[in-house]
């Protein structure tokens, strides 16, 4: 199960945070800093995308200047979550048309809607890009 999902840039600014386990505000701030210090200096070519973190694992993937991080239980399948992160980015790309950091900042409510279509209550909910994009089209029509 997911504990949280963070999207951070190279400077450590959090662009999106979704918490599936209750944390205090102080703990959230501390976790954001720890996660960034953990994944930012890692070498993409020679180190894996999985990092042990407290009693969990952090599964992360870097796209351009953004780190997409998911904190999962130690007994969960890391590769499934790595693919789920990639799937989430593919949906963002399709929805926004070559997504960038500014899309996440200025359309954060849409990004949260996309995230909620892919993950539900800390579990992977949907794996079909077409189904997610169709649901998002229906949501866009309501606005």
Curated annotation (Swiss-Prot):
Keywords: Cell membrane, Coated pit, Endocytosis, Membrane, Protein transport, Transport. Coiled coil: none annotated. It is a peripheral membrane protein. It is found in: Cell membrane; Membrane, Coated pit. Component of the adaptor complexes which link clathrin to receptors in coated vesicles. Clathrin-associated protein complexes are believed to interact with the cytoplasmic tails of membrane proteins, leading to their selection and concentration. Adaptor protein complex 2 (AP-2) is a heterotetramer composed of two large adaptins (alpha-type subunit APL3 and beta-type subunit APL1), a medium chain (mu-type subunit APM4) and a small adaptin (sigma-type subunit APS2). This is AP-2 complex subunit sigma.
């Amino acid at each position: 199960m997911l504990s949280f999902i963070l999207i951070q840039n190279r400077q450590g600014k959090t662009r999106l945070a979704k918490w599936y386990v209750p944390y205090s505000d102080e703990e959230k701030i501390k976790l954001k800093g720890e996660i960034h210090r953990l994944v930012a200096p890692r070498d993409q070519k020679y180190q894996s995308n999985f990092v042990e973190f407290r009693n969990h694992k952090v599964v992360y993937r870097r796209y351009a200047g953004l780190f997409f991080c998911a904190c999962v239980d130690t007994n969960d399948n890391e590769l499934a979550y790595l693919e789920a992160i990639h799937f989430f980015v593919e949906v963002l790309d399709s929805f926004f048309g070559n997504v960038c950091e500014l899309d996440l900042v200025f359309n954060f409510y849409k990004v949260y809607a996309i995230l909620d279509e892919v993950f539900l209550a800390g579990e992977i909910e949907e794996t079909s890009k077409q189904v997610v994009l169709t649901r998002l089209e229906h949501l866009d029509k309501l606005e």
